């Protein structure tokens, strides 16, 4: 019987914490956790540990937080753990070849897409915006390129019409934990089979930018709706009404035709605020006024604020 794998885990946000929890539940020996340095957060701008660090401390696992691995001292510290494998999930720090080569069996990455589609930083949101019918988890052997390594295991989930960036993220986070537990079991039995990625099929999920969330009403309603879903909970789509920023949390799209200028409010009811788009009509069902919380259209009408009024033309550009 083979000896238990000594695992280093590297990750930072909630997505990674789900994978670490799955490994702990499966009784894997986590010899160290690597995570990004604590960041200022909250009203007091105090340094707060991320979800992965909090979980590691709860289980008394050694935590390392190098800024990067340019320092030989940091690279040697990692080697000193003598890990069999390093599991990486949304770590947020580029790993040089010296780190990738340090564990006996290299580094395995939990990536939230079906590679080679959506390599890069924001695969969940890009899949929703593109109208993909499915997403999933790829466990891959890491190499120097951006998400270019051999694929070791894949699991698939459909993307439903109701999915948002949050719901798909949470589902993939759970799937990622299940997939890495399975992958490590296969690794220990020498049963993992590597499949090279087809580079000509690769697409890139560029990092999200806040300005992307500004709604361009000249776009098709269906595309705007997918962006609203993808950018929930961040950065949240927004538009402007008389210079005031209105955040849009939920909406549906229809192919209804309108001759009105894109951005024109066509209907304002307790059910929805309907807006003309470049193609079709967007029905907004949840929005957020300046300084407030997300509300329904019924709350908008009852609130009596002179915003999102019938006939108003919402701004397309800044």
Curated annotation (Swiss-Prot):
Give the binding site residues for (6S)-5,6,7,8-tetrahydrofolate: 113-116
Q: Which reaction does it catalyse?
A: L-methionyl-tRNA(fMet) + (6R)-10-formyltetrahydrofolate = N-formyl-L-methionyl-tRNA(fMet) + (6S)-5,6,7,8-tetrahydrofolate + H(+)
Task: Kindly state which keywords UniProt assigns to this record, in alphabetical order.
Answer: Protein biosynthesis, Transferase
* Top-rank taxon, per record: Bacteria
Specify whether RNA-binding is a keyword of the entry: no
Query: What terms describe the molecular function in GO for this protein?
Result: methionyl-tRNA formyltransferase activity
> Could you say which EC number(s) this protein's record lists?
2.1.2.9
What PANTHER family does this protein map onto? METHIONYL-TRNA FORMYLTRANSFERASE, METHIONYL-TRNA FORMYLTRANSFERASE, MITOCHONDRIAL
Function of the protein: Attaches a formyl group to the free amino group of methionyl-tRNA(fMet). The formyl group appears to play a dual role in the initiator identity of N-formylmethionyl-tRNA by promoting its recognition by IF2 and preventing the misappropriation of this tRNA by the elongation apparatus.
Q: Which family does the entry's similarity section mention?
A: Belongs to the Fmt family.
Return the protein name.
Methionyl-tRNA formyltransferase
Q: Which organism is it from?
A: Hahella chejuensis (strain KCTC 2396)
Its taxonomic placement starts with: Bacteria, Pseudomonadati, Pseudomonadota, Gammaproteobacteria, Oceanospirillales
């Amino acid at each position: 019987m083979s000896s238990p794998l000594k695992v280093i885990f590297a990750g930072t946000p909630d997505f990674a914490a789900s994978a670490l929890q799955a490994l702990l539940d499966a009784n894997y020996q986590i010899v160290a956790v690597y995570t990004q340095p604590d960041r200022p957060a909250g009203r007091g701008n105090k340094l707060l540990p991320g979800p992965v660090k909090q979980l590691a401390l709860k289980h008394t696992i050694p935590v390392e937080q190098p800024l990067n691995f340019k320092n030989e001292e940091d690279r040697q510290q990692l080697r000193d753990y003598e890990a069999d494998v390093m599991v990486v999930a949304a770590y947020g720090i580029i790993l040089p070849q010296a780190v990738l080569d340090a564990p006996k069996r290299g580094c395995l990455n939990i990536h939230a897409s079906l590679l080679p589609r959506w390599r890069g930083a924001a695969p969940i949101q890009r899949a929703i915006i593109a109208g993909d019918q499915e997403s999933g988890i790829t466990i891959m052997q890491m190499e120097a390129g951006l998400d270019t390594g051999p694929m070791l295991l894949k699991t698939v989930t459909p993307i439903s019409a109701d999915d948002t960036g949050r719901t798909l993220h949470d589902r993939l986070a759970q799937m990622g934990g299940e997939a890495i537990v399975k992958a490590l079991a296969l690794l220990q039995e020498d049963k993992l089979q590597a499949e090279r990625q087809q580079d000509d099929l690769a697409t890139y999920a560029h990092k999200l930018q806040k300005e992307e969330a500004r709604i361009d009403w000249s776009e098709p309603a269906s595309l705007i709706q997918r962006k609203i879903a993808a950018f929930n909970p961040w950065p949240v789509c927004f538009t402007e009404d008389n210079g005031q920023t209105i955040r849009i949390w939920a909406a549906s799209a229809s192919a209804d035709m309108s001759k009105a200028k894109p951005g024109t409010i066509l209907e304002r009811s307790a059910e929805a605020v309907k807006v003309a788009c470049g193609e079709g009509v967007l029905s907004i069902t949840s929005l957020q006024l300046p300084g407030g919380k997300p509300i329904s259209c019924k709350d908008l009408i009852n609130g009596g604020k002179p915003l999102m009024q019938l006939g108003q033309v919402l701004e397309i550009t800044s």
